[in-house]
Curated annotation (Swiss-Prot):
The keyword Transmembrane applies. Belongs to the nematode receptor-like protein srb family. One of its GO terms (cellular component) is perikaryon. Residues 45-58, 125-141, 209-237, 298-341 are cytoplasmic. Its main location: membrane. This is Serpentine receptor class beta-3. It holds the Pfam family 7TM_GPCR_Srb. GO terms for biological process: sensory perception of chemical stimulus. The chain crosses the membrane at residues 24-44, 59-79, 104-124, 142-162, 188-208, 238-258, 277-297. It comes from Caenorhabditis elegans.
Amino acid sequence: MLETNDSVCELAYQLAYHPVYRSSQFWSMLVSSLSIPALIYFITRKIFFLHFHGNLKCLLIVYFICNLLFSMALCFAFFYQFLIPFFVTSKCQLLINTTLFKWGQICSFLLLTSSMLLPIGFSIERFVALGNAQKYESSRTFLGPVIIFIIIAVDFSIIFSVYKNEPFTEGFYSFILVPSTTASQINMYFFVLLFVKIFNLLLNCILLRIHKKIRIKYYSLSVRYEMEEILQSSKFTFIIRFTHLLFFGFYVVVILFVRIMGESFFNGTLNYSVARGVFCTVPTYNLIIVIIGIKSLRHLNLQRLNKVQSTVQIKSTGKEGSKNYEDIITNYWDSVSSRTP
């Protein structure tokens, strides 16, 4: 047991001063710290003031709050791992306290997986909105909180079942590296989440196609306006899901590849551990999504404004313009005739 501990301490020491691993820690620390004020601004100044229905807004707020809390957890983790080598006096002091590692990783994974599952709620809410377009905007905010509760409860149950028998007896030198006794279950859960996210993105594509087909059936100006609101909000959630899938998909594919190939492929435990630790793309996503979100909202709002203006304007050219002119003249003379004694 002592020999194993010594080998773990030696590995922690080599990782702490490995240039590639060290650079990845610094990058993750930097983007995590930058993403915190960026997400706070995005939530309080953009998401809170969206014109979307309360159900979708509630889902978006909780989704980005999960990202914010996860960024805070990552910021602490990477600051800790980056700075601790400057203050230790022995190699084994580089190992993370077991209790700190246990609760840090469980809470971090719960926030990470919750943010991966919450976009499923976007699809459910959007299909309900599309199916009840004529009266959905006047409905109360109830569906969103229910979906949030169910998704978080399911995710909590899965994470609890994964970690309930984990003894946490290994020496831990990184918050993002899963214990070997739990790694297979976490990998399986991530693999399932990847397929769920792909399926969810396909559902969003189907939703947008259905929207384009049925919106021509509505002639009421108010319903057409509601349909345009649903379309714009669905496009925004599509952008979020697509961006999340790119980053998360890359992370899962790379991590599974590293684990499947094993230590022999990377010529030793050190290179294998470096490969496992440097491909965490989630901190970068938490910063990039704010930039993409602000730009996409600006574009969609401009698109929405132009669409609404074109919808309420009366055309004055072509066959439709001629018909509008005749209708106006007819209505005018009918009103004059009705006032003539």
